[in-house]
Amino acid sequence: MAGERAQNLQDTFLNHVRKNKIPLTIFLVNGVKLQGVVTWFDNFCVLLRRDGHSQLVYKHAISTIMPGHPVQLFEQGEEGAEKG
């Protein structure tokens, strides 16, 4: 169940930043920093667009994703906002 929740959170986050065209900074496991907007994603990769160019990034290479501004995915009190 924890794996399903993590996948659902990942999909929810990526879909939100894609729909709202929120700029992201993505750090890869090798330290490379990428910036752009998510235009598409699936279970294995993310398509990142910047300055008219697209980059296909494999999720296993991603370390951290930082949105350009705060993202509110859940309303307070919703299941996804539970305290840990």
Swiss-Prot record:
Domain Sm: 11-71
Gene3D superfamilies: 2.30.30.100
Record's keyword annotation contains Ligase: no
A GO MF label: RNA binding
GO biological process terms, semicolon-separated: regulation of DNA-templated transcription; regulation of RNA stability; regulation of translation, ncRNA-mediated
Quaternary state and interactors: Homohexamer.
Protein name per its UniProtKB record: RNA-binding protein Hfq
Lineage: Bacteria, Pseudomonadati, Pseudomonadota, Alphaproteobacteria, Hyphomicrobiales
Gene name, Swiss-Prot/TrEMBL: hfq
